[in-house]
Every structure is written in C-alpha cells, then in structure tokens.
C-alpha cells in the first residue's frame, strides 16, 4: 500500500489468544535513495470475538415432567410415585464446547471480576461476543468468593446425596468423579486427552474394570468448568458420562498430599505479594547466612551496627535503599568521563533527590561514631600528705 510516497507494511504475529500487528512505515525516499529509519507501531488486540455456538438457545430448562407426587426444589425433581434409575434416564448432550474454536472476547472482558458463561461451558451460548460472561478457560489469576463457583452460582453448606450440583463452600474440591466410561486398555490416555482441554491436571486415577476415573485439577475453577463441560458428554465410544464431585479420600497419604498442596498454594500466594529482596533474605536466613547479610548492610551504609527497618529496606521502585545507594555510587558514568565538575554536580543532584539516605546525615553519624569519650574530672579533689 502506497500513499504520498510512503510505503506501509503490516505484519501480524499470533501469540496465545492475542494478535500483535506491527506496522512498518518507511519514510519518503530522496533522489539519492537515502532511506530514513522506519517507525514501528505495535497494536495489540484480541485474536477473535467469541463465536456463537448455536443460533437460538433451546428452552428445555423447564420443570420436568411429573413422575411423582411431591416436587423437591433442592434436587429439582419429583419424589414419590414412579421410580426410575437416574443413570439410565440420562440423555447425551447434543452440544459441546471446543475451546480452540469457541473462545474469544466478550463484553465481560471489560468488567473485572466477571463470571464465566455456563452456557458456553455446555456449548450452547447464542450470544457470542455480546455475552455478559467470559468465554474462555479459568486462569490462576481468577479468584472468586468461597460461597460461589466460577459461574456465579451460590454454593451450599453440604453436598447433595448424589454429589452433583454446585458443591459446598466448606471444602475446596479439586477432584471429579467420572463414571460410565467404556472399559478399554487405553482408558487412561483417553480420559487424559479429553479432560486436559479444560485445565492443568495434577493426577488421574483410573479403575479399568469398572469404567471409573478420578481426575484432580490444579485449580478449583478448572474443575468446576470441566464438570459442566463434560456432563452428559462422550469420549471415544459414544457413551454418556456421569460427572460428579468426588468424596473425601480416606487414604492418609491422600489427605497428607491435599494438606501439602493447600500449604504450597498459600505459600505461593504470599510469595507473589512479597518483594524479591525480602525472599532472598529469607533464603539466606534459612541457609544460616544471616550474619553475612548484616555485615553487607553495614558496609553499604558505612555505619557499624546500623540495620535499616524493613519498610525502608524492602521499598519498591526508585525509593528502595538499594536503588538509592546505586544512584549515589554511579550517578552517571558518561558524565564522569567528561569532567570532574560535571560529576560533582550530578552527585549533588542525585543526593538531593535521595529520600531515605542523605549523605549529610551519614557523614554526621560517622563523625558522632568517631567521637572520643574523655574522662570527666571529679567534683571533689583529694590530696596526699606527701605532695605538700
């Protein structure tokens, strides 16, 4: 594309779900064919808008047919009267979510703290990019209150008897129970391939003879998303899966592993909030090198026995102690080569901008440290008789 003697080149790079456009603009060439430096303008935008999975949403979410006499609001079914096996009455879902094809940006991306679209997880959202909920997979940075799931549905104090539904807010459950799998020799590979689409998996335990699998995710939100996405779906043999929450494993080794995982998650969350220098100091203290750190601080400040407070030592940005000391030691290498007068001015300017470590204060403290304490004379003098 050329306009007014300018040439424009557009380069598109794809990375994750974002597209980076690099626009290279060449200046007007002179008669001597001297080229000016090209300007690079980087424009980042989302890869694609969310896709409409279906045209119109089926209105099947109505009250079920009345096979009994009393309607139970908690279980959303009728009780009494006719009895039927709930596992045999399950119907395979006609829609399924495909992350690589259906995910994209929606109106919810502009609102921090938005929930995920339940119909998107089930593969039946008809809103597309106009949806007010997120159309993507949950990430580690997505946090929600303990009383709601990633779709915004309220949790209950206890699980249902069939371990279905939203779940309980008294326990963080990362494990799904998947039944109705066709027993094969490669059942573990099939389960891993289908369920790895919804997030990072920590471990998979498969019972080949019974067609049952227990899948543990690293993130609870991914487990919630996978439960809704794989409910009434099939793997490779046209079966209808029964996806439920897993009960507590009575194995002591499993309980210890869950406790260790919770402690690691809490430690990682705290580490992200602490300064890097503070983490390095903790590591040195753990290895028995706290004395070296104290001596290093004394040498940096030039004051024996002086250790700054944690608020001063671990301040972030340009106000940190280490940045202030580095500014005092290396004000400007390029100006130091030109002349000593310019160096003196740059050091003075840097010291005047120092908020925490002032050179005048340090010099006064060093003078006070070197002061010699003389013995004071007594108030009453005593004379010996020999002196007379």
Curated annotation (Swiss-Prot):
Alphabetic keyword roster: Cell cycle, Metal-binding, mRNA processing, mRNA splicing, Nucleus, RNA-binding, Spliceosome, Zinc, Zinc-finger
GO cellular component: nucleus; post-mRNA release spliceosomal complex; Prp19 complex; spliceosomal complex; U2-type catalytic step 1 spliceosome; U2-type catalytic step 2 spliceosome
Subcellular location: Nucleus
Pfam families attached to this UniProt entry: RRM_1 (PF00076), Torus (PF16131)
InterPro entries: Cwc2/Slt11, Cwc2_RRM, Nucleotide-bd_a/b_plait_sf, RBD_domain_sf, RRM_dom, Torus, Znf_CCCH, Znf_CCCH_sf
Superkingdom in the source lineage: Eukaryota
GO BP field: mRNA cis splicing, via spliceosome; spliceosomal snRNP assembly
Annotated GO MF terms: pre-mRNA binding; U6 snRNA binding; zinc ion binding
Region described as Disordered: 43-63, 331-352
Main location (coarse class): nucleus
Domain RRM residue range list: 174-248
Zinc finger (C3H1-type): 111-138
CDD domains: RRM_cwf2
Gene3D superfamilies: 3.30.70.330
Assembly and binders: Belongs to the 40S cdc5-associated complex (or cwf complex), a spliceosome sub-complex reminiscent of a late-stage spliceosome composed of the U2, U5 and U6 snRNAs and at least brr2, cdc5, cwf2/prp3, cwf3/syf1, cwf4/syf3, cwf5/ecm2, spp42/cwf6, cwf7/spf27, cwf8, cwf9, cwf10, cwf11, cwf12, prp45/cwf13, cwf14, cwf15, cwf16, cwf17, cwf18, cwf19, cwf20, cwf21, cwf22, cwf23, cwf24, cwf25, cwf26, cyp7/cwf27, cwf28, cwf29/ist3, lea1, msl1, prp5/cwf1, prp10, prp12/sap130, prp17, prp22, sap61, sap62, sap114, sap145, slu7, smb1, smd1, smd3, smf1, smg1 and syf2.
PANTHER family: PRE-MRNA-SPLICING FACTOR CWC2, PRE-MRNA-SPLICING FACTOR RBM22
Function recorded in the entry: Involved in the first step of pre-mRNA splicing. Required for cell growth and cell cycle control. Plays a role in the levels of the U1, U4, U5 and U6 snRNAs and the maintenance of the U4/U6 snRNA complex. May provide the link between the 'nineteen complex' NTC spliceosome protein complex and the spliceosome through the U6 snRNA. Associates predominantly with U6 snRNAs in assembled active spliceosomes. Binds directly to the internal stem-loop (ISL) domain of the U6 snRNA and to the pre-mRNA intron near the 5' splice site during the activation and catalytic phases of the spliceosome cycle.
Family stated for the protein in its record: Belongs to the RRM CWC2 family.
Domain notes for this protein: The C-terminal RRM domain and the zinc finger motif are necessary for RNA-binding.
Protein name per Swiss-Prot or TrEMBL: Pre-mRNA-splicing factor cwf2
Record organism: Schizosaccharomyces pombe (strain 972 / ATCC 24843) (Fission yeast)
């Amino acid at each position: 594309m050329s306009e007014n003697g300018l040439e424009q080149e557009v380069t598109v790079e794809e990375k994750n779900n974002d597209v980076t456009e690099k626009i290279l603009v060449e200046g007007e060439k002179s008669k001597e064919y001297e080229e000016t430096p090209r300007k690079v303008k980087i424009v980042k935008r989302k890869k694609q808008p969310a896709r409409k999975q279906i045209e119109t949403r089926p209105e099947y979410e109505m009250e079920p047919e009345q096979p009994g006499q009393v309607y139970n609001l908690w279980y959303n079914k009728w009780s009494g009267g006719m009895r039927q096996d709930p596992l045999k009455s399950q119907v395979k879902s006609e829609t399924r979510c495909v992350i690589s094809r259906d995910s994209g940006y929606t109106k919810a991306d502009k609102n921090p703290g938005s929930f995920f679209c339940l119909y998107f997880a089930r593969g039946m959202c008809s809103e597309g990019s106009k949806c007010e909920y997120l159309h993507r997979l949950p990430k580690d940075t997505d946090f929600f209150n303990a009383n709601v799931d990633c779709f915004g549905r309220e949790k209950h104090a206890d699980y249902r008897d069939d371990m279905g539904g939203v779940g309980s807010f008294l326990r963080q459950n990362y494990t799904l129970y998947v039944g109705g799998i066709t027993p094969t020799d490669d059942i573990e590979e099939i389960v891993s391939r289908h369920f790895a689409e919804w997030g990072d998996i920590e471990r998979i335990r498969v019972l080949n003879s019974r067609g049952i699998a227990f899948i543990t995710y690293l993130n609870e939100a991914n487990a919630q998303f996978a439960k809704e996405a794989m409910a009434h779906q099939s793997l490779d043999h046209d079966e209808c899966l029964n996806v439920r929450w897993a009960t507590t494993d009575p194995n002591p080794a499993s309980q210890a592993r869950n406790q260790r995982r919770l402690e690691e998650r809490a430690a990682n969350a705290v580490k992200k909030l602490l300064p890097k220098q503070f983490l390095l100091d903790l590591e040195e203290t753990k290895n028995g090198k706290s004395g070296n750190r104290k001596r290093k601080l004394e040498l940096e400040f030039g004051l024996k026995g002086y250790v700054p407070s944690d608020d001063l030592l671990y301040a972030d940005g340009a106000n940190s102690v280490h940045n202030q000391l580095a500014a005092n030691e290396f004000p400007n290498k390029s100006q130091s080569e030109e002349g000593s007068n310019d160096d003196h001015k740059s050091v003075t300017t840097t010291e005047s901008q120092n908020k925490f470590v002032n050179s005048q204060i340090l010099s006064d403290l060093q003078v006070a440290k070197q002061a010699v304490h003389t013995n004071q004379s007594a108030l009453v003098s005593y004379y010996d008789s020999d002196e007379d």
